[in-house]
Amino acid sequence: MPEPVAEPALNGLRLNLRIVSIVMFNFASYLTIGLPLAVLPGYVHDAMGFSAFWAGLIISLQYFATLLSRPHAGRYADVLGPKKIVVFGLCGCFLSGFGYLLADIASAWPMISLLLLGLGRVILGIGQSFAGTGSTLWGVGVVGSLHIGRVISWNGIVTYGAMAMGAPLGVLCYAWGGLQGLALTVMGVALLAILLALPRPSVKANKGKPLPFRAVLGRVWLYGMALALASAGFGVIATFITLFYDAKGWDGAAFALTLFSVAFVGTRLLFPNGINRLGGLNVAMICFGVEIIGLLLVGTAAMPWMAKIGVLLTGMGFSLVFPALGVVAVKAVPPQNQGAALATYTVFMDMSLGVTGPLAGLVMTWAGVPVIYLAAAGLVAMALLLTWRLKKRPPSALPEAASSS
């Protein structure tokens, strides 16, 4: 974890601008993810002639690479400092675009072209994990650990913004210049971000002795489990709300997803100091309660307006879960291990979103679409119970106490 630079307290607009000036590098990394997201599946299936399996695999490779590389990103950020990790990650984003460019050049040889696309996706996954983890820690190093919740919140906001912008922009780039035009756009975004990052002052890495990975995992896994359980609600909304609306014979699934995103971002903007004022565990429990109500409304909805209110509440509830639990998880380890703690904690969300889709699909096939929202509400209720138990544990039994001993 970087050591924050000693300077006067930051407040309000100045604080937010300071944070945004760093998390914009995470925005750039997610923009390089969003740009090809709506293009590559169709390109692999229609233009290259491969099956839907290969089209899906090309997209999934990035997520697997992110999942496997994230703990290493946190560890290296603790040792080398977050700025170097961000630049390294952005270089990976640049190389992913170069991989797409080579795939376009090799389009006469479909297997080679597919291999180059897959390589680009793997490099992108590694780059995103490093740029995302590093930008959070860099932001904390700039504004101080008191504002870690706000830094994490802003990272989520720019992530959603980049993905929302990237997909339609990528379609336009592909329509304009084919895969080559898309690749050059990805490379241009990453290169611009690298050039903006290099002159920025770095923050010092903490020189303390790092804990082994197993020790870090032991101190954050309960918070990660609560996050994983709560992420199921987000997963079933994002993946299956369209099928839910189709099963009901309703229109407006896209608007429901828009409501979720607006609620997610709006809640983070409206309550930037909620975690500092109430505490991470308290905020998480409130959020779980709101998310449960939202999922129950969706699962039992008899009218479209009920489902839309449910989706809105689910977005509001899930919005602050990650930063609220993340603040507590990061403080459960010494400063020199907080990068590893943040990365390890994030892995639980990655894994949850990875398994929610197929498991919910099996449940949906067996019991119908609405049941998955009721099941997700049950999982979030388990997260609420787990967090309540964590709050009730005596201080001597909490990971934070152990980390300071």
Curated annotation (Swiss-Prot):
What Pfam families would the database entry show? MFS_1
Taxonomically, the superkingdom here is: Bacteria
Q: Which InterPro entries match?
A: MFS, MFS_dom, MFS_trans_sf, MFS_Transporters, MFS_YhhS-like
Write out the annotated subcellular location: Cell inner membrane
GO CC terms: plasma membrane
Q: Does the keyword Transmembrane apply?
A: yes
Q: Spell out the molecular function terms from Gene Ontology.
A: transmembrane transporter activity
Gene3D superfamilies named in the record: MFS general substrate transporter like domains
Q: What is the protein named?
A: Uncharacterized MFS-type transporter YhhS
**What is the native source organism of this protein?**
Salmonella paratyphi C (strain RKS4594)
